[in-house]
Amino acid sequence: MGHDADDPMAEGEVGRVGVSISNVEDMKVLFDGIPLDDVSTSMTINATAPMLLAMYVVVAEESGADVSRLRGTVQNDILKEYAARGTYVYPPAPSVRFAMDLCAYCAEHVPRWNTISVSGYHIREAGATAVQEVAFTLADAIAYVEAARDRGIDLEVFASRLSFFFDAHSDLFEEVAKLRAARRMWARIVRERFGIESPRAQMLRFHTQTAGVSLTAQQPELNVVRVTLQALAAVLGGTQSLHTNSRDEALALPTEESATIALRTQQVIAEESGVASVVDPLGGSYYVEWLTDSIEAEVEGELSKIDELGGATAAIEKGHYQKAIARSAYKEQKAIEEGRRVVVGVNRYAADEPARMEILRVDPSILEEKRASLTRLRASRDARAVDESLRRLAEAAERGDPTMPPLIACARARATLGEMSRAVERAFGRYRPAGSLW
Protein backbone atom coordinates (compact mmCIF):
# COMPACT_ATOMS: atom_id res chain seq x y z
CA MET A 1 0.00 0.00 0.00
CA GLY A 2 3.05 2.28 0.02
CA HIS A 3 3.17 2.98 3.77
CA ASP A 4 6.27 3.02 5.96
CA ALA A 5 6.26 0.99 9.16
CA ASP A 6 5.73 4.13 11.26
CA ASP A 7 2.73 5.31 9.26
CA PRO A 8 -0.50 5.09 11.33
CA MET A 9 -2.06 3.16 8.42
CA ALA A 10 0.51 0.39 8.94
CA GLU A 11 -0.31 -0.18 12.60
CA GLY A 12 -1.51 -3.73 13.12
CA GLU A 13 0.21 -4.89 9.92
CA VAL A 14 3.89 -4.75 10.88
CA GLY A 15 5.17 -8.22 11.72
CA ARG A 16 1.92 -9.85 10.62
CA VAL A 17 1.67 -9.38 6.85
CA GLY A 18 4.97 -10.40 5.29
CA VAL A 19 8.38 -8.88 5.98
CA SER A 20 8.27 -5.18 6.84
CA ILE A 21 10.59 -3.35 4.41
CA SER A 22 10.60 0.45 4.56
CA ASN A 23 14.07 1.20 3.14
CA VAL A 24 17.32 -0.23 1.81
CA GLU A 25 18.69 -0.82 5.31
CA ASP A 26 15.75 -3.14 6.09
CA MET A 27 16.48 -5.04 2.87
CA LYS A 28 20.16 -5.30 3.83
CA VAL A 29 19.28 -6.91 7.15
CA LEU A 30 16.96 -9.38 5.42
CA PHE A 31 19.65 -10.57 3.00
CA ASP A 32 22.69 -10.23 5.23
CA GLY A 33 25.29 -12.84 4.30
CA ILE A 34 23.37 -14.08 1.25
CA PRO A 35 25.15 -13.73 -2.13
CA LEU A 36 22.29 -12.27 -4.16
CA ASP A 37 23.72 -13.25 -7.54
CA ASP A 38 23.81 -16.91 -6.43
CA VAL A 39 20.20 -17.26 -5.22
CA SER A 40 16.70 -16.79 -6.61
CA THR A 41 14.44 -14.44 -4.64
CA SER A 42 10.66 -14.24 -4.90
CA MET A 43 8.80 -11.12 -3.76
CA THR A 44 5.03 -11.03 -3.39
CA ILE A 45 4.56 -7.31 -3.92
CA ASN A 46 2.44 -5.41 -6.41
CA ALA A 47 1.61 -1.70 -6.22
CA THR A 48 5.09 -0.90 -4.89
CA ALA A 49 6.96 -3.65 -6.74
CA PRO A 50 9.22 -1.16 -8.59
CA MET A 51 10.27 0.41 -5.26
CA LEU A 52 11.09 -2.96 -3.69
CA LEU A 53 13.04 -4.12 -6.74
CA ALA A 54 14.96 -0.82 -6.73
CA MET A 55 15.96 -1.47 -3.11
CA TYR A 56 16.96 -5.03 -3.97
CA VAL A 57 19.16 -3.78 -6.82
CA VAL A 58 20.88 -1.28 -4.51
CA VAL A 59 21.51 -3.97 -1.88
CA ALA A 60 23.00 -6.15 -4.62
CA GLU A 61 25.20 -3.31 -5.88
CA GLU A 62 26.45 -2.41 -2.41
CA SER A 63 27.22 -6.04 -1.59
CA GLY A 64 29.31 -6.42 -4.75
CA ALA A 65 26.87 -8.69 -6.59
CA ASP A 66 26.53 -8.57 -10.36
CA VAL A 67 23.09 -7.04 -10.98
CA SER A 68 22.85 -8.62 -14.44
CA ARG A 69 23.05 -12.07 -12.79
CA LEU A 70 20.23 -11.51 -10.30
CA ARG A 71 17.48 -14.12 -10.49
CA GLY A 72 14.01 -14.11 -9.02
CA THR A 73 10.36 -13.21 -9.37
CA VAL A 74 8.31 -10.21 -8.41
CA GLN A 75 4.54 -10.57 -8.47
CA ASN A 76 3.94 -7.10 -9.97
CA ASP A 77 0.36 -8.08 -10.95
CA ILE A 78 -1.48 -4.87 -10.23
CA LEU A 79 -4.71 -5.60 -12.12
CA LYS A 80 -5.92 -8.30 -9.73
CA GLU A 81 -5.55 -5.84 -6.84
CA TYR A 82 -8.53 -3.82 -8.09
CA ALA A 83 -10.65 -6.94 -8.50
CA ALA A 84 -9.73 -8.91 -5.42
CA ARG A 85 -6.97 -8.09 -2.96
CA GLY A 86 -7.32 -4.32 -2.68
CA THR A 87 -3.69 -3.31 -2.13
CA TYR A 88 -3.61 -0.78 -4.96
CA VAL A 89 -2.36 2.80 -4.69
CA TYR A 90 -2.67 4.45 -8.11
CA PRO A 91 -5.38 4.23 -10.81
CA PRO A 92 -5.31 1.17 -13.10
CA ALA A 93 -3.88 2.67 -16.31
CA PRO A 94 -0.84 4.43 -14.78
CA SER A 95 -0.32 1.43 -12.51
CA VAL A 96 0.02 -0.87 -15.53
CA ARG A 97 2.49 1.61 -17.01
CA PHE A 98 4.43 1.56 -13.71
CA ALA A 99 4.52 -2.24 -13.81
CA MET A 100 5.85 -2.05 -17.37
CA ASP A 101 8.62 0.29 -16.22
CA LEU A 102 9.88 -2.57 -14.06
CA CYS A 103 9.55 -5.04 -16.94
CA ALA A 104 11.43 -2.80 -19.38
CA TYR A 105 14.22 -2.19 -16.87
CA CYS A 106 14.66 -5.88 -16.17
CA ALA A 107 14.62 -6.79 -19.87
CA GLU A 108 17.67 -4.56 -20.32
CA HIS A 109 19.50 -4.82 -17.00
CA VAL A 110 18.25 -7.90 -15.09
CA PRO A 111 17.39 -10.34 -17.90
CA ARG A 112 17.05 -13.39 -15.64
CA TRP A 113 14.28 -11.82 -13.56
CA ASN A 114 10.64 -12.99 -13.87
CA THR A 115 8.87 -9.67 -13.99
CA ILE A 116 5.17 -10.54 -13.51
CA SER A 117 3.45 -13.45 -11.79
CA VAL A 118 -0.17 -13.23 -12.93
CA SER A 119 -2.28 -14.24 -9.98
CA GLY A 120 -5.61 -16.00 -10.06
CA TYR A 121 -5.18 -17.04 -6.43
CA HIS A 122 -6.42 -13.79 -4.93
CA ILE A 123 -9.32 -13.66 -7.40
CA ARG A 124 -10.49 -17.12 -6.30
CA GLU A 125 -10.00 -16.31 -2.62
CA ALA A 126 -12.22 -13.25 -3.07
CA GLY A 127 -15.07 -15.52 -4.13
CA ALA A 128 -14.64 -16.17 -7.86
CA THR A 129 -15.55 -19.50 -9.41
CA ALA A 130 -12.93 -21.75 -11.01
CA VAL A 131 -13.99 -20.49 -14.45
CA GLN A 132 -13.73 -16.85 -13.39
CA GLU A 133 -10.33 -17.49 -11.82
CA VAL A 134 -8.91 -18.78 -15.10
CA ALA A 135 -10.71 -16.23 -17.29
CA PHE A 136 -9.70 -13.16 -15.30
CA THR A 137 -6.13 -14.40 -14.89
CA LEU A 138 -5.68 -15.04 -18.61
CA ALA A 139 -7.34 -11.71 -19.46
CA ASP A 140 -4.91 -9.91 -17.15
CA ALA A 141 -1.99 -11.74 -18.74
CA ILE A 142 -3.22 -10.69 -22.20
CA ALA A 143 -3.35 -7.07 -21.00
CA TYR A 144 0.24 -7.26 -19.78
CA VAL A 145 1.51 -8.75 -23.04
CA GLU A 146 -0.32 -6.02 -24.97
CA ALA A 147 1.22 -3.37 -22.70
CA ALA A 148 4.67 -4.88 -23.23
CA ARG A 149 4.11 -4.82 -26.99
CA ASP A 150 3.09 -1.16 -26.85
CA ARG A 151 6.22 -0.45 -24.80
CA GLY A 152 8.45 -2.08 -27.41
CA ILE A 153 9.55 -4.98 -25.21
CA ASP A 154 10.46 -8.17 -27.08
CA LEU A 155 7.30 -10.27 -26.70
CA GLU A 156 9.01 -13.65 -26.92
CA VAL A 157 11.35 -12.67 -24.09
CA PHE A 158 8.53 -11.08 -22.08
CA ALA A 159 6.13 -14.02 -22.41
CA SER A 160 8.93 -16.44 -21.53
CA ARG A 161 9.39 -14.59 -18.25
CA LEU A 162 5.70 -14.56 -17.28
CA SER A 163 4.60 -16.93 -14.54
CA PHE A 164 1.18 -17.65 -13.04
CA PHE A 165 -0.25 -18.30 -9.58
CA PHE A 166 -3.41 -20.36 -9.05
CA ASP A 167 -5.61 -21.52 -6.18
CA ALA A 168 -6.15 -25.20 -5.38
CA HIS A 169 -9.67 -25.50 -3.98
CA SER A 170 -11.59 -28.45 -2.60
CA ASP A 171 -13.36 -29.91 -5.67
CA LEU A 172 -10.53 -32.17 -6.79
CA PHE A 173 -11.66 -32.92 -10.35
CA GLU A 174 -12.69 -29.32 -11.05
CA GLU A 175 -9.30 -28.06 -9.91
CA VAL A 176 -7.41 -30.58 -12.05
CA ALA A 177 -9.54 -29.73 -15.09
CA LYS A 178 -9.18 -26.00 -14.45
CA LEU A 179 -5.39 -26.19 -14.50
CA ARG A 180 -5.38 -28.41 -17.60
CA ALA A 181 -7.67 -25.97 -19.42
CA ALA A 182 -5.57 -22.96 -18.42
CA ARG A 183 -2.41 -24.62 -19.69
CA ARG A 184 -3.66 -25.34 -23.19
CA MET A 185 -5.54 -22.05 -23.47
CA TRP A 186 -2.46 -19.98 -22.63
CA ALA A 187 -0.40 -21.82 -25.25
CA ARG A 188 -3.05 -21.07 -27.85
CA ILE A 189 -3.37 -17.39 -26.81
CA VAL A 190 0.38 -16.83 -27.07
CA ARG A 191 0.57 -18.56 -30.43
CA GLU A 192 -2.60 -17.30 -32.13
CA ARG A 193 -3.26 -13.90 -30.56
CA PHE A 194 0.33 -12.72 -30.38
CA GLY A 195 2.01 -14.82 -33.07
CA ILE A 196 4.73 -16.11 -30.75
CA GLU A 197 5.96 -19.53 -31.86
CA SER A 198 8.50 -20.13 -29.08
CA PRO A 199 7.52 -23.24 -27.07
CA ARG A 200 9.04 -21.68 -23.94
CA ALA A 201 6.88 -18.57 -24.32
CA GLN A 202 3.79 -20.77 -24.68
CA MET A 203 4.45 -22.61 -21.43
CA LEU A 204 2.09 -21.96 -18.51
CA ARG A 205 4.68 -21.80 -15.75
CA PHE A 206 2.63 -21.76 -12.57
CA HIS A 207 2.75 -21.98 -8.80
CA THR A 208 -0.23 -23.17 -6.76
CA GLN A 209 -1.30 -22.54 -3.19
CA THR A 210 -4.00 -24.40 -1.32
CA ALA A 211 -7.20 -22.48 -0.60
CA GLY A 212 -6.89 -20.32 2.48
CA VAL A 213 -10.56 -19.39 2.22
CA SER A 214 -11.53 -23.05 2.73
CA LEU A 215 -9.84 -23.30 6.14
CA THR A 216 -12.11 -23.28 9.17
CA ALA A 217 -11.65 -22.02 12.72
CA GLN A 218 -13.98 -24.82 13.84
CA GLN A 219 -12.21 -28.19 14.25
CA PRO A 220 -9.02 -26.78 12.70
CA GLU A 221 -7.35 -30.21 12.68
CA LEU A 222 -9.63 -31.03 9.72
CA ASN A 223 -7.77 -28.40 7.73
CA VAL A 224 -4.87 -30.85 7.39
CA VAL A 225 -7.19 -33.13 5.40
CA ARG A 226 -8.50 -30.24 3.29
CA VAL A 227 -4.99 -29.05 2.47
CA THR A 228 -3.89 -32.58 1.56
CA LEU A 229 -6.72 -33.01 -0.95
CA GLN A 230 -6.11 -29.57 -2.42
CA ALA A 231 -2.37 -30.20 -2.73
CA LEU A 232 -3.08 -33.50 -4.46
CA ALA A 233 -5.36 -31.72 -6.94
CA ALA A 234 -2.61 -29.20 -7.70
CA VAL A 235 -0.07 -31.96 -8.35
CA LEU A 236 -2.49 -33.92 -10.53
CA GLY A 237 -3.17 -30.69 -12.42
CA GLY A 238 0.51 -30.21 -13.20
CA THR A 239 1.69 -27.47 -10.83
CA GLN A 240 5.42 -26.77 -10.93
CA SER A 241 5.63 -25.48 -7.37
CA LEU A 242 3.30 -25.63 -4.41
CA HIS A 243 2.53 -23.93 -1.11
CA THR A 244 0.47 -25.86 1.42
CA ASN A 245 -1.37 -23.77 4.00
CA SER A 246 -1.14 -24.53 7.70
CA ARG A 247 -3.99 -25.93 9.78
CA ASP A 248 -4.25 -22.88 12.08
CA GLU A 249 -4.33 -20.09 9.49
CA ALA A 250 -8.04 -19.42 10.05
CA LEU A 251 -7.02 -18.41 13.58
CA ALA A 252 -3.63 -16.72 13.31
CA LEU A 253 -0.25 -16.83 11.63
CA PRO A 254 0.93 -20.45 11.67
CA THR A 255 3.02 -21.88 14.47
CA GLU A 256 6.26 -23.66 13.59
CA GLU A 257 4.59 -27.02 14.29
CA SER A 258 1.68 -26.25 11.95
CA ALA A 259 3.99 -25.02 9.20
CA THR A 260 6.06 -28.20 9.54
CA ILE A 261 2.96 -30.38 9.11
CA ALA A 262 2.07 -28.38 5.99
CA LEU A 263 5.56 -28.98 4.59
CA ARG A 264 5.47 -32.68 5.47
CA THR A 265 2.14 -32.94 3.62
CA GLN A 266 3.91 -31.96 0.41
CA GLN A 267 6.77 -34.33 1.12
CA VAL A 268 4.47 -37.31 1.69
CA ILE A 269 2.69 -36.61 -1.60
CA ALA A 270 5.99 -36.16 -3.44
CA GLU A 271 7.95 -39.02 -1.88
CA GLU A 272 5.35 -41.66 -1.02
CA SER A 273 2.34 -41.42 -3.33
CA GLY A 274 3.94 -41.72 -6.76
CA VAL A 275 1.57 -39.15 -8.30
CA ALA A 276 4.44 -36.82 -9.16
CA SER A 277 6.12 -39.49 -11.28
CA VAL A 278 3.60 -39.24 -14.13
CA VAL A 279 2.85 -36.30 -16.43
CA ASP A 280 -0.88 -35.48 -16.57
CA PRO A 281 -1.91 -38.74 -14.85
CA LEU A 282 -5.66 -38.09 -15.24
CA GLY A 283 -5.40 -37.31 -18.95
CA GLY A 284 -7.66 -39.63 -20.93
CA SER A 285 -10.23 -39.98 -18.18
CA TYR A 286 -13.64 -39.43 -19.76
CA TYR A 287 -14.85 -37.21 -16.92
CA VAL A 288 -11.65 -35.16 -16.63
CA GLU A 289 -11.44 -34.60 -20.39
CA TRP A 290 -15.12 -33.60 -20.54
CA LEU A 291 -14.73 -31.25 -17.58
CA THR A 292 -11.57 -29.71 -19.05
CA ASP A 293 -13.40 -29.01 -22.32
CA SER A 294 -16.40 -27.57 -20.45
CA ILE A 295 -14.27 -25.21 -18.36
CA GLU A 296 -12.33 -24.12 -21.43
CA ALA A 297 -15.55 -23.28 -23.29
CA GLU A 298 -16.86 -21.23 -20.35
CA VAL A 299 -13.55 -19.40 -20.00
CA GLU A 300 -13.62 -18.56 -23.71
CA GLY A 301 -17.05 -17.01 -23.18
CA GLU A 302 -15.77 -14.88 -20.30
CA LEU A 303 -12.75 -13.76 -22.33
CA SER A 304 -15.04 -12.69 -25.16
CA LYS A 305 -17.05 -10.52 -22.74
CA ILE A 306 -13.85 -8.90 -21.45
CA ASP A 307 -12.65 -8.24 -25.01
CA GLU A 308 -16.00 -6.58 -25.79
CA LEU A 309 -15.50 -4.31 -22.77
CA GLY A 310 -12.11 -3.21 -24.11
CA GLY A 311 -9.81 -5.63 -22.32
CA ALA A 312 -8.90 -6.34 -18.71
CA THR A 313 -8.04 -2.79 -17.62
CA ALA A 314 -11.25 -1.36 -19.06
CA ALA A 315 -13.30 -4.24 -17.61
CA ILE A 316 -11.87 -3.52 -14.16
CA GLU A 317 -12.47 0.22 -14.50
CA LYS A 318 -16.10 -0.57 -15.40
CA GLY A 319 -16.46 -2.90 -12.39
CA HIS A 320 -17.02 -6.07 -14.43
CA TYR A 321 -14.60 -8.26 -12.46
CA GLN A 322 -15.69 -6.87 -9.12
CA LYS A 323 -19.41 -7.40 -9.73
CA ALA A 324 -18.91 -10.93 -11.06
CA ILE A 325 -16.76 -11.94 -8.08
CA ALA A 326 -19.16 -10.38 -5.57
CA ARG A 327 -22.12 -12.27 -7.03
CA SER A 328 -20.24 -15.58 -7.02
CA ALA A 329 -19.07 -15.04 -3.44
CA TYR A 330 -22.63 -14.27 -2.35
CA LYS A 331 -24.00 -17.42 -4.00
CA GLU A 332 -21.32 -19.57 -2.38
CA GLN A 333 -21.85 -18.13 1.09
CA LYS A 334 -25.62 -18.47 0.79
CA ALA A 335 -25.22 -22.12 -0.21
CA ILE A 336 -23.08 -22.72 2.89
CA GLU A 337 -25.52 -20.96 5.20
CA GLU A 338 -28.46 -22.92 3.76
CA GLY A 339 -26.57 -26.21 4.05
CA ARG A 340 -26.55 -26.93 0.32
CA ARG A 341 -22.77 -26.68 0.32
CA VAL A 342 -21.37 -28.84 3.11
CA VAL A 343 -18.46 -27.62 5.22
CA VAL A 344 -17.61 -30.38 7.66
CA GLY A 345 -17.41 -29.09 11.22
CA VAL A 346 -19.24 -25.88 10.35
CA ASN A 347 -22.70 -26.62 8.95
CA ARG A 348 -22.54 -30.40 9.37
CA TYR A 349 -20.89 -32.62 12.00
CA ALA A 350 -20.20 -29.63 14.21
CA ALA A 351 -18.43 -30.19 17.53
CA ASP A 352 -20.13 -29.38 20.82
CA GLU A 353 -17.03 -27.73 22.27
CA PRO A 354 -14.98 -24.98 20.59
CA ALA A 355 -11.52 -25.94 19.33
CA ARG A 356 -8.56 -25.31 21.59
CA MET A 357 -5.26 -24.78 19.83
CA GLU A 358 -2.06 -22.95 20.64
CA ILE A 359 -1.67 -20.02 18.25
CA LEU A 360 1.21 -17.74 17.36
CA ARG A 361 1.17 -14.35 19.07
CA VAL A 362 3.22 -11.56 17.52
CA ASP A 363 5.42 -9.55 19.88
CA PRO A 364 4.04 -5.96 19.84
CA SER A 365 7.55 -4.58 20.46
CA ILE A 366 8.36 -5.30 16.80
CA LEU A 367 6.42 -2.20 15.75
CA GLU A 368 8.31 0.04 18.17
CA GLU A 369 11.64 -1.36 16.97
CA LYS A 370 10.70 -0.60 13.36
CA ARG A 371 9.63 2.94 14.24
CA ALA A 372 12.88 3.58 16.09
CA SER A 373 14.88 2.23 13.16
CA LEU A 374 13.16 4.62 10.76
CA THR A 375 13.78 7.56 13.08
CA ARG A 376 17.51 6.75 13.15
CA LEU A 377 17.61 6.40 9.35
CA ARG A 378 15.98 9.77 8.74
CA ALA A 379 18.37 11.45 11.17
CA SER A 380 21.51 9.97 9.60
CA ARG A 381 20.87 10.33 5.85
CA ASP A 382 21.56 13.30 3.57
CA ALA A 383 18.17 15.05 3.56
CA ARG A 384 19.07 17.22 0.56
CA ALA A 385 20.02 14.18 -1.53
CA VAL A 386 16.77 12.47 -0.55
CA ASP A 387 14.66 15.48 -1.52
CA GLU A 388 16.45 15.82 -4.87
CA SER A 389 16.01 12.14 -5.72
CA LEU A 390 12.31 12.28 -4.85
CA ARG A 391 11.84 15.41 -6.96
CA ARG A 392 13.39 13.68 -9.98
CA LEU A 393 11.22 10.63 -9.42
CA ALA A 394 8.03 12.72 -9.36
CA GLU A 395 9.11 14.54 -12.53
CA ALA A 396 9.85 11.27 -14.36
CA ALA A 397 6.44 9.87 -13.41
CA GLU A 398 4.74 13.09 -14.51
CA ARG A 399 6.50 13.14 -17.89
CA GLY A 400 5.96 9.45 -18.58
CA ASP A 401 9.68 8.72 -18.46
CA PRO A 402 11.01 5.38 -17.13
CA THR A 403 10.77 5.40 -13.35
CA MET A 404 13.20 2.61 -12.42
CA PRO A 405 16.41 4.71 -12.72
CA PRO A 406 15.10 7.48 -10.41
CA LEU A 407 13.66 4.86 -8.04
CA ILE A 408 17.10 3.25 -7.77
CA ALA A 409 18.59 6.70 -7.12
CA CYS A 410 16.00 7.23 -4.36
CA ALA A 411 16.91 3.90 -2.81
CA ARG A 412 20.62 4.77 -2.87
CA ALA A 413 19.84 8.06 -1.10
CA ARG A 414 17.89 6.09 1.56
CA ALA A 415 14.48 7.46 0.68
CA THR A 416 11.80 5.31 2.28
CA LEU A 417 9.09 3.27 0.60
CA GLY A 418 6.43 5.71 1.76
CA GLU A 419 8.34 8.71 0.45
CA MET A 420 8.84 7.12 -2.97
CA SER A 421 5.19 6.09 -3.10
CA ARG A 422 3.99 9.61 -2.32
CA ALA A 423 6.31 11.07 -4.98
CA VAL A 424 4.77 8.81 -7.64
CA GLU A 425 1.29 9.54 -6.30
CA ARG A 426 1.79 13.23 -7.03
CA ALA A 427 1.94 12.31 -10.71
CA PHE A 428 -0.48 9.38 -10.90
CA GLY A 429 -3.02 10.29 -8.22
CA ARG A 430 -4.59 7.86 -5.75
CA TYR A 431 -7.28 5.42 -6.87
CA ARG A 432 -10.62 5.53 -5.10
CA PRO A 433 -13.20 3.15 -6.58
CA ALA A 434 -16.72 4.42 -7.02
CA GLY A 435 -20.07 2.76 -7.60
CA SER A 436 -21.94 -0.29 -6.37
CA LEU A 437 -20.80 -3.88 -6.82
CA TRP A 438 -24.36 -4.88 -7.57
Model features per residue range: what roles?
Residues M1-H169, E174, R193, R200-H207, ...:
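Catalytic alpha/beta active-site cores
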Residues H3-D4, L79, A252-L253, I325, ...:
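Short Asp/Glu-rich motifs
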Residues G15-S22, T41-L52, E62, T87-F98, ...:
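Catalytic cores of large soluble enzymes that bind and process phosphate-bearing ligands
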Residues E25, L53-A54, R184-M185, R226, ...:
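A generic alpha-helix surface/boundary motif
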Residues D32-L36, V58-D66, M100-R112, D140-I153, ...:
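Generic secondary-structure signature for well-ordered alpha-helical cores
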Residues S119, A135-Y144, S160-G345:
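Active-site capping/gating regions of soluble enzymes
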Residues E256, R264-Q267, E271-W438:
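Flexible, glycine-rich loop/tail regions that form catalytic "lids" or insertion modules at the edges
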